[in-house]
């Protein structure tokens, strides 16, 4: 008897919902065109009405990063028009951006940037990676995997691998740590001094902090003439040319100005990865950021938990960057998984 009542209640609920939705859509359609009961026309009208209902949402995720008017703090900082990747079409830097970028890692006599970029795009494609272009509808889930020791014994691996995109950075290994950090990598952010060998299908995103960084990537896949920047670097790398992407210097400045408010000398690869992902993804989850549960700052592949010299260089403001990501999580723009 109880089962019959539950079944009856479900049927009645479904009928009421169906009548309400049908009435709503028909009334809405009536204001646009004369209502017709031809099946094909009905489907078209319902489809158009659904599009109108969801058009104000930039994605189909529970929380869409690009959705505005939910946080004044976010709206003041997030600028969707700033392009994260350098291409042949957007390669010209404004003077103030160029002067600022030249100061990040000073060179004695940097070569002409325009000539360097022209040579760069003779060797690598000068187009945006089609994978990274935002879709009009959908939910692109991305994992940004940092290098914190809090990933050890976290068992996040399968969860990380379930994302559409998995972004890693610098010298981060996966071999030997698969259970905690996963095996999947779609994009890997590096600069010449932090490069590591990548998988065949991994897109390399070069983060250039100086002119020679752009020259190095050309050299490393052709002549192999550059072996030193401010420290020895790999002479040759094995990366497919169509898998090489360049982080836009103007986007680095955008992160520094808008998100870091001028804190630190320039942004870390970690925060650059986070803001980059917010511009190409609909939903972003962070793993391996911050200290472990004991307050130690170290890399997950290191056996010395008390390490953490990277926080003491004076180049990056780790505390301010951490506050930015914490605020983004508090307003439901990203999620942070803190591990152990």
Curated annotation (Swiss-Prot):
Residue numbers on the Lumenal membrane side: 35-340
Residues binding substrate, per UniProt: 105, 147, 170, 230, 266, 270, 290, 299, 316
Any Gene Ontology biological process: sialylation
Cytoplasmic side: 1-13
Reaction catalyzed: a beta-D-galactosyl-(1->3)-N-acetyl-alpha-D-galactosaminyl derivative + CMP-N-acetyl-beta-neuraminate = an N-acetyl-alpha-neuraminyl-(2->3)-beta-D-galactosyl-(1->3)-N-acetyl-alpha-D-galactosaminyl derivative + CMP + H(+); a ganglioside GM1 + CMP-N-acetyl-beta-neuraminate = a ganglioside GD1a + CMP + H(+); a ganglioside GM1 (d18:1(4E)) + CMP-N-acetyl-beta-neuraminate = a ganglioside GD1a (d18:1(4E)) + CMP + H(+); ganglioside GM1 (d18:1(4E)/18:0) + CMP-N-acetyl-beta-neuraminate = ganglioside GD1a (18:1(4E)/18:0) + CMP + H(+)
PTM comment text: The soluble form derives from the membrane form by proteolytic processing.
Any one Pfam family match given in the protein's UniProt record, by short name: Glyco_transf_29
Pathway listed: Protein modification; protein glycosylation; Glycolipid biosynthesis
Alphabetically ordered keywords of this record: Disulfide bond, Glycoprotein, Glycosyltransferase, Golgi apparatus, Lipid metabolism, Membrane, Secreted, Signal-anchor, Transferase, Transmembrane, Transmembrane helix
Function according to Swiss-Prot or TrEMBL: A beta-galactoside alpha2->3 sialyltransferase involved in terminal sialylation of glycoproteins and glycolipids. Catalyzes the transfer of sialic acid (N-acetyl-neuraminic acid; Neu5Ac) from the nucleotide sugar donor CMP-Neu5Ac onto acceptor Galbeta-(1->3)-GalNAc-terminated glycoconjugates through an alpha2-3 linkage. Adds sialic acid to the core 1 O-glycan, Galbeta-(1->3)-GalNAc-O-Ser/Thr, which is a major structure of mucin-type O-glycans.
Record's protein name: CMP-N-acetylneuraminate-beta-galactosamide-alpha-2,3-sialyltransferase 1
